[in-house]
Amino acid sequence: MDILLLMVGLLLGAGGVFVMLRNQSNQALVERDARIDLLQKQAQEQVRNAAKEVELAMKGERIQIREELESELRSRREEVDSHQVRLDKRESQLDRKIEQVDRRDQELDQRRGQLDKEQKKVEERQQHFERLIVDADKKLEEIAGLTRDEAKSRIQAELVDRARHEASRQLKQIEDDTRAQAQKKAQEVICSAIQRFAGEFVVDRTVSVVQLPTDEMKGRIIGREGRNIRALEAATGCDLIIDDTPEAVVISGFNPVRRQVARRALEELVGDGRIHPARIEEVVRKARKVVSQEIREAGEQAVYDVGISNMHPEIIKLLGTLKFRTSYTQNVLAHSVEVAHFAGIMAEEMGLDGKLARRCGLLHDIGKAVDHDNPGSHAVLGGELCKKYKEDDTVTNAVWSHHFDIEPNSVYGPLTNAADALSAARPGARRENVETYIRRLEELERIATEFKGVEKAYAIQAGRELRVMVAYDRVNDEGSMLLAREIAQQVESEMTYPGEIKVTVIREMRASEIAR
């Protein structure tokens, strides 16, 4: 019974719960439908508002576009109006110009007619004057006793003298102004180069004399029946002169490298004491290797000292060979290094490529390394070597033209020539023997005295200056300038000399009278 009541209670409770849940569900559905209706109304209201806003925006844009179009049309209309005004103005100007041209054509026609009339009058007057000139020439010939050609020649000669006088005066003025400016600039550049460079030595002689410990060593050098000296001369290609000079042997040969090999070999033989043909050949081979190594090292050191690179090995070898060459007792390799430094410094002072100038200066005498084996001047040979070993065209031309064998195509040719002259002209840099010195002075004086109007000529300052005395009644002041230039050009073309020579022409007039 209790169980039955419990089950009935459970059923009643479940039914109540079911009824309650169904009522709640119905209420939720009603509320959801109400919210959906509210959202739909709000969405419709937003759509209507958005449509109104879009419509208003489109109206605003249409109004703005209409205003912009109207503004553009107004500006275009104004441009067209202004353009039309300009066209009207130009049309009126063209009309006025056409009228002016028409008037000028009429005036030209009138002037042409007047010119034709005046031309006829001029021709008539010219014929009249020609007749007068012929009559005057006849009368002048009768009065002066000169023919027309003779008078013309005399007048032409006077005009030529007058023109030469005027040209000489102007040339002197131009030269004075140019020389003053050039001298000032050249002094600045050269002084800067001299101040910035300091050479280590002045003169370096290539030794060709070997000192002996005793005179008895001469006999050992000669050997039995001269076998040793003949073997040494054959191996080195040089002549050995053994005379009365005490404790010395002179090595003679045109090739400086062979001379150096012979000197080293002979010194080693003398120091070792073993002198026979087999030993001589061995020592000469060893000396040749040592000299070759010394040549290469000297060339590399010169290139390093100058501060350049990418030099062909054969060029470096030839540079080293210059260590054993001298020019007026000046070592050619040291001279080349000095010229390279001078050229580089002057190039930098002038705003040029200093490295390229140093390369030109270092190679300018490279032809002296081979000129005893090949014909031609050292400048030409040097240019051919630079061309052969693919040096820059500017360097090749500078080497080729530094003595003006050809025309320089850049400023580096004259620059190399100036550096070469600067190195050679330093006091003590070069020396020459007495015979050559006297011959050069006599040649200078001979060249000067060959010119017309020269009375005397004196070479002074060791041949660095040539003073020329001229006759005052045969050479005037302007002619003195031309004479100095002509003498200098003649000296340049006929003589070879280190440095430069100054030519000074002196014209002096003395007047005297005796008071009684």
From Swiss-Prot:
Record-annotated KH domain positions: 206-269
Location of the protein in the cell: Cell membrane
Residues in HD domain copies: 332-425
InterPro entries, A to Z: HD/PDEase_dom (IPR003607), HD_domain (IPR006674), HDIG_dom (IPR006675), KH_dom (IPR004087), KH_dom_type_1 (IPR004088), KH_dom_type_1_sf (IPR036612), Ribonuclease_Y (IPR017705), RNase_Y_N (IPR022711)
Family matches, as CDD domains: HDc, KH-I_RNaseY
Enzyme nomenclature, EC number: 3.1.-.-
UniProt GO molecular function: RNA binding; RNA endonuclease activity
Membrane topology: Single-pass membrane protein
Pfam families from the UniProt entry: HD, KH_1, RNase_Y_N
SMART domains xref list: HDc, KH
Residue stretches spanning the membrane: 1-21
Gene Ontology CC terms: plasma membrane
Record NCBIfam families: HDIG (TIGR00277), RNase_Y (TIGR03319)
Family: Belongs to the RNase Y family.
Role, per record: Endoribonuclease that initiates mRNA decay.
Protein name: Ribonuclease Y
Source organism (scientific name): Magnetococcus marinus (strain ATCC BAA-1437 / JCM 17883 / MC-1)
